[in-house]
From Swiss-Prot:
Its cofactor is Mg(2+). Its main location: cytoplasm. PANTHER family: DNA POLYMERASE KAPPA, DNA REPAIR POLYMERASE UMUC / TRANSFERASE FAMILY MEMBER. It catalyses: DNA(n) + a 2'-deoxyribonucleoside 5'-triphosphate = DNA(n+1) + diphosphate. It comes from Stenotrophomonas maltophilia (strain R551-3). Binds 2 magnesium ions per subunit. Residues 7-187 form the UmuC domain. The gene is dinB. It is an enzyme of class 2 (transferase). This is DNA polymerase IV. Its EC number is 2.7.7.7. Poorly processive, error-prone DNA polymerase involved in untargeted mutagenesis. Copies undamaged DNA at stalled replication forks, which arise in vivo from mismatched or misaligned primer ends. These misaligned primers can be extended by PolIV. Exhibits no 3'-5' exonuclease (proofreading) activity. May be involved in translesional synthesis, in conjunction with the beta clamp from PolIII.
Amino acid sequence: MTRLRKIIHVDMDAFYASVEQRDDPSLRGKPVVVAWRGARSVVCAASYEARVFGVRSAMPAVRAERLCPDAIFVPPDFARYKAVSQQVREIFLRHTDLVEPLSLDEAYLDVTEPKSGMELATDIARTIRAQIREETQLTASAGIAPNKFLAKIASDWRKPDGQFVIPPQRVDAFLLPLPVNRVPGVGKVMEGKLAARGIVTCGDLRQWALIDLEEAFGSFGRSLYNRARGVDERPVEPDQQVQSISSEDTFAEDLPLEDLGEAIVQLAEKTWNATRKTERVGHTVVLKLKTAQFRILTRSFTPERPPESMEELRDIALALRARVDLPADTRYRLVGVGLSGFRDKEPVVQGELFEH
């Protein structure tokens, strides 16, 4: 009989903004937005005081300013965030060696066989959160469940500064009424497609056969089928290394190529901010486009050295747009900007612009 796993997903609360408020007492209790100012900037993080006004990470900074005119904008300091993240990671490692960081502010922990000797995963999560608070003066939320999928959902249930457990015997009761938009990978576009088929909850999803979901949604259909049943066999992988990072945007209305510039700029900044959470560098810039007819194109470029700034990434992505050779009247429903070929910093050989 397979032993049930005990998985914890720990998510720091408004991490970047909370670090800024911790280090500058004048910011405490005020709406803080971590972002560079400017028409092309995007929000890296928002304090809970700013979130009350609808400010969210990854939204354009100009929109955040409109939503919350009194917000205090603070430029991100990734070196400082990385240092705090390392403190938190050392706390995790006191309890288990099976720690899979997802970014600077969140990680999965497999505590099926913990170092600390504590039997209950809820006690381990509570202890970890207390240690984080005591040693960093920051708060974290945690989800405890039999697998990664459920633990990640649970960590958002009692935010901020709380924890929530989904025991094995309660998985069905938890999932059946759960809205499908809480399932990772189900964004607004997919949510609309599911709703058009009468699928609003995971309980609705369970009424569909696997073959029908795969026919309707391709390979993602299998993921939907499994998640609706609480199935996720993915292990916690401590040595997992980032191979690619990308950001995508699906438009409400299809756009011509010349109108994609603003989206490319914002996605380049979002991707760049995500890469700052890793210790490696991406060498190849990738531009992804999907036409109104659902044709997917990618254009990529590997420069002599990896991009060293958001501006370099942005400029290469914009240059790749000029390499798209479809008819001028082609319209696009999705654009993505990414970095791939991640590796440790080392000299690289000049690449060439190429198309897929």
